[in-house]
Structures are given as structure tokens and as C-alpha cells.
Amino acid sequence: MKLDLNSQTLNVSFACRIEDAWVPVPETACTQSGFDWTLNGAHYSAQFTPAGDTLCYTLQMDAPNPTQLRMWLAVPGQSDYFHVIPCNIYGDNHAAEAKPGEFPLLMKDHHEVAFCAPLWEFRADRAAMPLAALCWDGGVAAAAVEPYSESEAGIIRNGVFAALPDAFGISLGYTNDPTTFKNRSTPAPSTRSMACKAQTSGRIYLHSGPRTELHEIIRQEYARHQDRAVPRNTLRQAVQGMLDTFAYQNFDAAAGEYTNRCCRPPRETEMRPWRLVTEIGWTGGGVLAYPLVLCRDALGADAEAPLAAAMSGEQLFDRIADAYNENSGLLNDLMAPNAAGSQVNGWWTGYGLVKDCHCAYTVGSAVHYLTKTMDYLHQNGKPCPAKWMDAAQKVLHTVMDLQRADGAFGYTYSTQERKVLDWSGFAGCWFAPALVYLYRLTGEERCLHSAEKALDYYHTFVKDLNCYGTPMDTWKAVDEEGNLAFMRGSRLLYEQTGKAEFLQYMKDSAGYEFLWRYGYKTYPEHTPLNQGWSACGGAVTSVSNPHIHPMGVIIDTDLRYLARVTGDGYYASRAADSAAWMLQCLELYPAATGYGRYGILSERWCPSDGLDVERFSDGRPFSSWFSHNLWASACVLEAACELLLEIEHKKG
């Protein structure tokens, strides 16, 4: 059947699951207002009701045996199709460079590989907003669904799907189709949720315009679904708790390094070191150092004892500056050589994508935090060591010398000469905000022009909803992390130049972030997230790592800035969700998690069935990870310090 909406047409069809087969609902049973159909005693129906520029729907089923009902929508005859299921599907998930078999690819090729298929369905609560969308040249359509339904047997979970070439839809009840993507490289058996009697509802959208029209649809659904966490503790308590944990638990005085630590409760609750944190950026180094510097102002005298007991942010930045490589003109990726003596091969080399090279992500992250800290100290009338500026200028001059004519920075660089090895990826965007900070510190116009050229280049990927190639452990999957650099760079350039294009870049960047940042509460099945926890405000890392991580919180300050300069409270609300999310996660320790102390925060939070692979020592499932990887809580420490200082500045 055909549905008319906003002077455009959607093809709509339905199918019900009878045992293991999908049975189409006859088109003769369908009208513009829905359908009503009975098969062997099973009754299925749909009702459509116009509501402004959207179409509300209700699906119902009442059957003698457990069943499901799918609603298919299609937009045939268009070009440049691009499917979106937030957190899961962005086009084909960059299949051109992805390694088949690592994570879902929406494609017809490699049918012999479990994670390559022309149709993908997930639990709706796997998506940051429970909807499936289809973009094409000139339009965007989407169907949103309530992620959960009441049934005769209790709560069932509903589904969202994407299908080549031009279809998408939702399911009352769900099937992980063709398989369950729990973890990269390892397919799990398909699971499903069925019921005899249940109903669900939602809205259908059909907009003209570019792919970024999807952001308005997300915004409208957010207004209906938002359910923010309600933390108990204050920001100051959180900052103190994390700093104390850094200093008194995770710093290893004998090794002279911060460490990542883990345990396995209930058998083993002592947090033991499993990896030294020696990388200069991304998962260590500057990511830790900047918030440690902020703690001095956020906590005052209360910061001095823990900082004295461990390694201060200033000491970390000294080591980062000392990692300068004269041959490459960049920073070595490690502050100290690994066990094999390499100064660049961090933990990520085990994934096989990069080795014996500089990575733009680690180097860019490090120099971003180095220049950000220098800018912060300068703004507050405080000095910083000359070698920090010397290292930052040398690295960023090298990066500018090697910048491509179209604005791109490299993904990897040679360690032996000043040369880009691989251009493909978003990781180099981290150099852009560093260049703006350096301009603010030195007045060097070349830095500003280089950053502007870079943001113009990377904006193409942001507006196309297709930012890929930032982390080195995801095989250049579409990810959330690179866009964080784009947001920071756009904010700094708008502050510096006042150009309207950079304000638009910020809006596009925020919209892309909200395709990863949950706008509603999910109901995970397992400890510790089945005790009232809300996913609202947490952001998923990539299509390769299907879990929420804390990195998105670092742009909350930029979202609050965007709210101020636009007068649009939507961005402030999204930032407030994030602050509440991170504080509630801290409060799960130790009572709900069964281990640790207040101030720990894992990098893995499982709002649905993605990556819920952790197990207690007695075999019970755990919806997080028994590892305290310092970068994760460092991101939260950064966001908490910045918000606390913003609040105190307003009071002053």
C-alpha cells in the first residue's frame, strides 16, 4: 500500500511471524488508515492517524501462539540511499575499508560472513533513539517505535531494521537478524522477543532535504522520550572521589606510572594493575593530565595531597613534551617504551590496523590537551613551561607542513621522516582544535587558516553522517569519537572568528553526536544497570564497539556554549542529561557493582544486548566491565571539573 505524507509517498507493507516464517499481510487487507487481518485465529492490525507533519501508528497482535508483527516502509525510485539506525547502521558502515566479519555491514557481498547481510534488525533499545531511517538524495524518512511493550508474559522488546536497497522499518517484538551482534569478530545466535498479545505505537516521518534533516526527527523524538537520571552526589564530591581514586588506587608508585586495574567479583574484589598507562593521548597522557591540572582550581587545597601522592598533570605534560621525535617532527605515541622497546606501538597494535607508525589520534589528542591546558593557564594568568610550547609548535608546524591541499590531515605518519602514511580517516581532526589554541597563544595566522581548511574538509563527513576512522581498534568503523574533535574545533573557530559557517558546523556536529547519545531510558536485564539506571545522556562509541562509553561528556561544555549563543535550550538539556548520566554511573560503586570504591568508572556500559559479555566469577552476567581504565574516568573528571568551574564562575 502507499501512504501519502507531506506531499510525498511511502510504500508500506506488513508481515507477521508464524513459527519461523514471515507471512505477508495481503495488500487487499490494507487501506490508508491501516489494516485489520485474521489468520488461523491470530488477529493483527495497524491504525494510522495524521498528526501535523507526521503520521502516528499503532500496531496490535492477538494470537494463540507467540508471534511478531513487522512494518516495512520503502522509498523506491530514488538515488544515493543511506540507511541509519542510530549507533548501529550508517549507510553500509564504511564497508569499503572495513574488515568483513568484525561488525555489521549492510551489504550484499560476503554473504558467507556472519556480519555481512542485506538486512539487519536490532533490538530497538540498541539505538540511541529507537527508530530506523532512510536518507536519499533530497529526502529523509524514519519510523520511530516504543522500545518496550507490555504483553501477557511481561515486557517484550521491539525492533528496528534496515534492508537493501530502499526499505526500513520497525517490529512489534524483535528478532536479531541475521545474527546477534554482541561483540566484534564473534557472532552470537539470533535472539528474539515474541508474545501472543501486545501492541506498540510510534510515528512515521517524511522530510525533504539533506541527511541532516534526521537531526530534527531525533529532536522531536527526544521531546517524547527523555528520561534523565537523578544523581544524589554533588559535582565536587565526584571530582574529589575520582581524584582520590586516581592517586590512591590507580597510581603505582613502584612503577612510577598510572595503571588500569581490574578484578573479578565476588571471588576477587581487589583491584589489581593489568596495564601501565603510558600512551600520550586518547587513552592516557593528556586525557589524564588536563583534568588533573583543573583539579587544583576545582578543589583548591583538597587537591594537593592526592596530587602529591601520585603524578600531577604538569608532570605528565612534561613527559609528553619530552616524547618529541626529531625525525618525524611529531610526538612518540608512548611516554615510555613498551616491553619490546617500541616508543610508538601501544596496546592498539594488537588489532592489526596500525604498527610502527605515529597515529594521528594519539598524537592529535595529546597536542590538543597540551595546547588546551596552556590556553587555560594563560587565561588564568598562570605560566607554563617553555618546553610545552616548544613541543606543541614543532608538532603542529609539522602537521601543517604535511596537510593536504583539501584540508585533510593524516591518519598515520612515519616515525622516520616527515611523511603521511595513510590519509583515510577522521582521527587527524584532533589537530584542528589544537591549532586554534596555538593561534590564541601565539597569534600565528597560519594556524587559524590551517584549522579552518581542516574543518571545511571534515565537515563533509559530519553532514553526511559518515565519520569513520578515528580509533585504531575498530578497523575504520563509523564512530562517534572523531566528531568530538570537530565539535571542539568548530566551537573555537566560531569564538575566534564569529563566522556563521562555524556555528552551523557546531549544530551539525551536535546533531551527529545525538545519533550516538541516548535520549531515553533503557531497561537492561543485568546487574548493575537493572536497578533504575538510565542510559539517557550516555553515548555509544562506534558501530564496532556496541556499548556506551564516557568520552562524549568532554563536549558538554561546547554544547552549553552552543545553547548560550543560539538561545536554544535543546543543547543545554542534552548536556544536562550527560552530566546526570555520568554522576549516576559513579554512584553505582561499590554497592551495585559489588566491587571498587566511589570514584571508579568503567569505560563500558551496556544499555541493551550489545557487548554484555562480562561475567562475575560465578557466571552471572554483568552489564559493565570489571576494569577501571583511567581514560574513561578522566573524561568524566574533565567534564565534572569544567562544569563545576563554570558554575562557580557564574556565582562569582
Where are these regions (language model features)?
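Alpha-solenoid helical-repeat scaffolds
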Residues: 229, 275-285, 304-307, 353-364, ...
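Carbohydrate-recognition beta-sandwich/jelly-roll modules
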Residues: 2-390, 394-397
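A domain-scale signal for long, ordered structural cores in large, multidomain proteins
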Residues: 421-432, 438-470, 475-508
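Well-ordered alpha-helical scaffold segments within catalytic/enzyme domains
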Residues: 286-305, 365-384, 429-444, 485-499, ...
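Non-catalytic carbohydrate-binding regions of carbohydrate-active enzymes
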Residues: 402-405, 442, 455-468, 472, ...
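Long, well-ordered core segments of solenoidal/helical folds
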Residues: 235-275, 308-335, 387-409, 445-469, ...
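Active-site lining segments of carbohydrate-active enzymes
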Residues: 345-354, 371-445, 507-517
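Carbohydrate-binding/catalytic loop surfaces
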Residues: 255-278, 329-360, 408-430, 467-489, ...
